[in-house]
Structures are given as structure tokens and as C-alpha cells.
């Protein structure tokens, strides 16, 4: 097909939008792919919609190739199915809730596990119907507290979500492996740089869970990779190697000291070394101190939040994402001044595990805080710290938690060297849900022996509209976007850069021949626009190939520009065949 720029609904911008922070947001707006309607809500203009449809086509091809069957559920859903799984409550404020005119509760679907499970229950009842994989490409809604970065973190977005149903755990393993491979093919075809990372299951539940993270310095997720081996994980899923337990017999008793100058960990360490405190015969370091972070935890459905103490070594900061992932689906926030005022036993800056336990506050510790480890920590009195407080003797945590930051150079699991940190954007997430949802909906199937059995379920999500933004993040330069042939709204951008009548007529002919060869062509036929503006727009819009008909056409030459690559001069009579071949090669 041919689309003429003279009639295309498009307005390019030379300046970045004021609210844009990341390159993808700036360029997608400037190039006329999207337009803001409200915070986190965007319209898809013709070029943007074509690119999204191209991504959807790749996704459909790969989903169909593994036996997926497409259907479509409504975005507007009743409350009852989500009550069955408790996610009406667990989703908290991120759920868009509404009532109809009769007062019945509804929601805008953030995800559709409930609907898939309930539908399979309604329609299937025999093992002969399984395995089955169903998927949809549907608009989703989440009330993000701080929507940002354009369509990377929006309130309305398009996702592909698929669900496998198998009669056995071995069958689930096979379905999971098929989806994992399909996702790799999708992302490879789209030209993405990504990592497959171990992940937490969160509110989705289930066991095995992996994320596909697109590598990006603007990513909201931090992930780690081992320097040797193949280990990769979202930091939320990294498991800290526990400390070594020690015999508490014969350890010195804890001693409380006046510490008037100890407002920071560094100051506390300097004070300890100034009075020659020894830890295992060496000077004190920040790792020998114990931070007590007070947070408020509200379980789903609870009216009040409960205070909880989080213990971690003083050389580590609390990682709120790791903390939240460890306590999900509960909501977590740091204690504020009013909480300290309402609880006088909380002495800000000097909170310790002993005072928390005495006042009935749950205490969760970093895995390094094990029996026999000795710590310098708050004495629950202003300007006083205790030295030599021993875990398992002087205090005992109620449990352990992954809440401390992961640092570059930390040991990798299984002896695979050390960890390196990188940032990424989640583009896909696959789960082995098991029987959480099929049990909740009492999905009972007759097995080969005529006995009732509950099928096991996998969940596989992929962000379609987010993928477009991620590709813009990874594939751009100072001049504009740089799409792959799989994603580009048009494979070839034909530019009539010469007002000579013969060149304009030839440009028309080239566009027609390229279209006849099966390529999608964007033809810049604007008569009153200068060549310089046309070239700038071509770079901004980002089509992979641009065919320029300029002054050289009189000598039988045309110019081919590969976006982000080389410029070359082609013989006019061979240009179409060469471009068709180059597009075909770029697809492979």
C-alpha cells in the first residue's frame, strides 16, 4: 500500500513536549505517533497505531504457532470473580472500580486470570479437552499512582495475555517452555536487546516465574547478572546468602553506651573505633551495625496498618521494591513522624530489636542476621547504642525478609562469580500458576480413570503498547526513531526531493512499484515542503529505508538511506529489486 504524506493525519514537532522525560516519550510525541489525553492516557495516531498493529501481528503469529487460540473478554468486568480470588481487595488502589446505575460493583480489567479459569470451567469437563492454550490481545487498566514516561507506565495499555490449562504438572512444564521460546522469537524478531530473569510471582501467585526485561538505562527495574554462568534475576527475586550461624556460648554480654555523636552509620562506626571496640579482633565497619527500619504493613482487607521492624546490616540501604515484593499483597510504607509520636517506645534514630519485641512489634530480619552474629544497634533510648547484641541470645527475629539493597560485586548464587547490576523495562512475564485459580473456581475435570481432577494453569503476559515504547528507547538517535522492518509503519519512505517534473513522476512510479512488490510505502509528495524538512521528517519518523529522488535522477541515479546506517547511490532501474531484497534480508 501507499500512504501519501500530503494527506496523512500527521503533525511533526521540532521541540520536545514539556512533560516528557525519556527519549521514547519525546520522540513518539514529536513524530506524531501518540498524543496525550490525560496523565497516563494516550491516543494512538495513524502511524503509532500501524506500528502497534505490526507488533500484534508478530505476537499472533508466534502464539498461533504454539497452538494458542485467540478470544476476547470484555474490559468491563463484574466484581464477583475477583472476590473469589480475593484480588478485588489485594489489588488495592491500583484497581479502577465503578458502579452501574443499580449500584452493582464493576472493575476495568487489569488482568483476566479469573475470566479464563471460569470460562474453561463452564465449557470443558473432560481430560480429552486438554491441553488448551487461550490468549487475547486486550486493553488493560491500572490506576498507577504516578504514571510516567508516556506509554511506558500508563493507566491504559494493550497487553497480550495467554493461559495454558494442563492435566498434569509435566504438561504445565511443557506449556511454559513453549511460551518461553515463543517470547524469545517475538523479541528477537522485533530486534530487542533483553534478558530473561528470575522473578517473584507477586499477587499472581504460583511457583516458577520469569521476567523478560528490555535493557534500558531508563528502566524502572533493576536486575542482576552473574559474571560467570547464566544467572539473571530481577533484584526483587535475588535470594541473599544467609550468614553463618555461630555458637553463642562464651560471647561477651551486650553493653550499652552513651553515643552523643551517632546520627549516621558512619558516625557510629567512627565512635566505635574511637573507643577501640573490636569485632572478631578487627575494627568495626558499617556491616557490623544493625539498622532497624520501622514500616507500616496493611494486609488486604485490614482497616489498620501494623508496625513492623525490618533489620538489616548498616552497610545496606532498604530496597523498597524488594521489601514490597517480600510482603505482597500487603501494602507497605515507611513510618512517619506521627507514628513515632503515637508510639513513644520508638526513639527515632535509636530503635533496636529489643524494644520492638518488648512492645509487641513484629521483627523481620535480613538473612545475614543469624544466631550467634553480634551487632551494634540502637538501645531504644536517645543517644544510646548497645554493643555486642547477639541474635538468638538477646533478640530473636520473628522471621526473615529480603529487603536490603543488592550491590555490585555481591556473590552470585551457586558460585557463579559475582553480580553485576543493570536496569531494564519489563516487557513480558511468565508464570506457572499451578492450581491457585482453578481451585478457587472449583474447575473439576474427569480424568482418564473417571475421577475428578483439577487442571493446572500457566499465565503469560506481554506488553504490546509498552513494546513500542521500549523499541523507541533502544532504537533511536539524536535525529529520531529507527524502526525494524517488523515494526515500522512502512518499510520504505520515498522522498521526492527535486521539484523537477520528471523526478516527481519517477517518485510516483517507484512508490507504485515498491507497493506492487508487497512493501508498505510512505510517500512524501508534499509540494510546498523543502527537501531539508522532508529529510528531517524522514529521520524523525524512523522508517528503515528511505529512497531519495533528487538531482542525481537526471543521470539515472537514486539515493538509498538505511536508517541509522549508510547512504548509497543506486542505479534507478535496479533500485526497486535491491530494496525488496534488502527488506527481505532484514526480516530474516
Swiss-Prot record:
Catalytic activities: tRNA(Pro) + L-proline + ATP = L-prolyl-tRNA(Pro) + AMP + diphosphate
Domain of life where this protein originates: Bacteria
GO molecular function: aminoacyl-tRNA deacylase activity; ATP binding; proline-tRNA ligase activity
Keyword set, alphabetical order: Aminoacyl-tRNA synthetase, ATP-binding, Cytoplasm, Ligase, Nucleotide-binding, Protein biosynthesis
Pfam families: HGTP_anticodon (PF03129), tRNA-synt_2b (PF00587), tRNA_edit (PF04073)
Domain notes: Consists of three domains: the N-terminal catalytic domain, the editing domain and the C-terminal anticodon-binding domain.
Subcellular location: Cytoplasm
The gene coding this protein: proS
InterPro entries to which the protein is assigned, alphabetical: aa-tRNA-synt_IIb, aa-tRNA-synth_II, aa-tRNA-synth_II/BPL/LPL, Anticodon-bd, Anticodon-bd_dom_sf, Pro-tRNA-ligase_IIa, Pro-tRNA-synth_IIa_bac-type, Pro-tRNA-Synthase_IIa_type1
Entry-linked SUPFAM superfamilies: Class II aaRS ABD-related (SSF52954), Class II aaRS and biotin synthetases (SSF55681), YbaK/ProRS associated domain (SSF55826)
Transmembrane segments: none
Protein's name in the database: Proline--tRNA ligase
One example of a Gene Ontology biological process annotation: prolyl-tRNA aminoacylation
Gene3D superfamilies given in the database record: Anticodon-binding domain, Bira Bifunctional Protein, Domain 2, YbaK/aminoacyl-tRNA synthetase-associated domain
Source species: Corynebacterium glutamicum (strain R)
Amino acid at each position: 500500500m501507499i500512504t501519501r504524506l500530503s494527506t496523512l493525519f500527521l503533525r511533526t514537532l521540532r521541540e520536545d513536549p514539556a512533560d516528557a522525560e525519556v527519549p521514547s516519550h519525546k520522540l513518539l510525541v514529536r513524530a506524531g505517533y501518540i498524543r496525550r489525553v490525560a496523565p497516563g492516557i494516550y491516543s494512538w495516531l495513524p502511524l503509532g497505531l500501524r506500528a502497534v498493529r505490526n507488533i500484534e501481528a508478530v505476537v499472533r503469529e508466534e502464539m498461533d504457532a504454539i497452538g494458542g487460540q485467540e478470544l476476547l473478554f470484555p474490559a468491563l468486568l463484574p466484581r464477583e470473580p475477583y472476590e473469589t480470588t480475593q484480588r478485588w481487595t489485594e489489588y488495592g488502589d491500583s484497581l479502577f472500580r465503578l458502579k452501574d446505575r443499580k449500584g452493582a460493583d464493576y472493575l476495568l480489567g487489569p488482568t483476566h486470570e479469573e475470566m479464563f479459569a471460569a470460562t474453561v470451567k463452564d465449557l470443558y469437563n473432560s481430560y480429552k479437552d486438554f491441553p488448551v492454550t487461550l490468549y487475547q490481545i486486550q486493553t488493560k487498566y491500572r490506576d498507577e499512582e504516578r504514571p510516567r514516561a508516556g506509554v511506558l507506565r500508563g493507566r491504559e495499555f494493550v497487553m497480550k495475555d495467554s493461559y495454558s490449562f494442563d492435566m498434569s504438572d509435566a504438561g504445565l512444564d511443557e506449556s511454559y517452555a513453549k511460551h518461553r521460546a515463543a517470547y524469545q522469537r517475538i523479541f528477537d524478531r522485533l530486534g530487542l536487546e533483553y534478558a530473561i530473569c528470575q522473578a517473584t510471582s507477586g499477587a499472581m501467585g504460583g511457583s516458577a516465574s520469569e521476567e523478560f526485561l528490555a535493557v534500558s538505562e531508563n528502566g524502572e527495574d533493576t536486575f542482576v547478572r552473574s559474571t560467570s554462568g547464566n544467572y539473571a534475576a530481577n533484584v526483587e527475586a535475588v535470594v541473599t546468602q544467609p550468614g553463618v550461624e555461630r555458637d553463642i556460648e562464651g560471647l561477651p554480654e551486650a553493653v550499652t553506651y552513651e553515643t552523643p555523636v551517632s546520627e549516621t552509620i558512619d558516625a557510629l562506626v567512627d565512635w566505635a573505633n574511637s573507643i577501640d571496640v573490636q569485632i572478631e579482633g578487627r575494627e568495626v565497619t558499617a556491616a557490623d551495625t544493625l539498622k532497624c527500619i520501622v514500616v507500616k504493613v496493611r494486609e488486604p482487607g485490614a482497616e489498620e496498618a501494623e508496625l513492623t521492624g525490618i533489620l538489616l546490616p548498616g552497610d545496606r540501604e532498604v530496597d523498597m521494591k524488594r521489601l514490597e515484593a517480600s510482603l505482597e499483597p500487603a501494602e507497605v510504607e515507611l513510618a512517619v513522624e506521627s507514628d513515632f509520636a503515637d508510639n513513644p517506645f520508638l526513639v527515632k534514630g535509636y530503635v533496636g530489636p529489643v524494644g520492638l519485641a518488648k512492645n509487641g512489634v513484629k521483627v523481620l530480619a535480613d538473612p545475614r542476621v543469624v544466631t550467634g552474629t553480634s551487632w551494634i544497634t540502637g538501645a531504644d533510648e536517645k543517644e544510646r547504642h548497645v554493643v555486642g547484641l547477639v541474635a538468638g541470645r538477646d533478640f530473636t527475629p520473628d522471621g526473615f525478609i529480603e529487603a536490603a539493597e543488592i550491590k555490585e560485586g555481591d556473590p552470585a548464587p551457586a558460585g557463579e562469580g559475582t553480580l553485576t547490576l543493570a536496569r531494564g523495562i519489563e516487557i513480558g512475564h511468565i508464570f506457572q500458576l499451578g492450581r491457585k485459580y482453578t481451585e478457587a473456581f472449583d474447575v473439576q475435570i474427569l480424568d482418564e480413570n473417571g475421577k475428578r481432577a483439577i487442571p493446572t494453569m500457566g499465565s503469560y503476559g506481554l506488553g504490546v503498547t509498552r513494546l513500542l515504547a521500549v523499541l523507541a528507547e533502544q532504537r533511536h538517535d539524536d535525529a529520531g526513531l529507527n524502526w525494524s522492518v517488523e515494526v515500522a509503519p512502512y518499510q520504505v519512505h520515498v522522498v521526492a526531493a527535486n521539484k523537477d517534473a520528471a523526478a516527481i513522476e519517477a517518485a510516483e512510479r517507484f512508490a507504485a512499484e515498491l507497493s506492487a512488490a508487497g512493501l508498505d510505502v510512505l510517500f512524501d509528495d508534499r509540494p510546498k515542503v523543502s527537501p531539508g524538512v522532508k529529510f528531517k521528517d524522514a529521520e524523525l519518523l524512523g522508517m528503515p529505508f528511505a529512497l531519495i529522488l533528487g538531482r542525481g535522477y537526471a543521470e539515472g541515479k537514486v539515493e538509498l538511506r538505511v536508517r541509522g546506517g549508510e547512504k548509497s547511490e543506486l542505479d534507478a532501474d535496479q533500485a526497486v529489486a535491491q530494496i525488496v531484497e534488502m527488506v527481505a534480508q532484514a526480516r530474516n
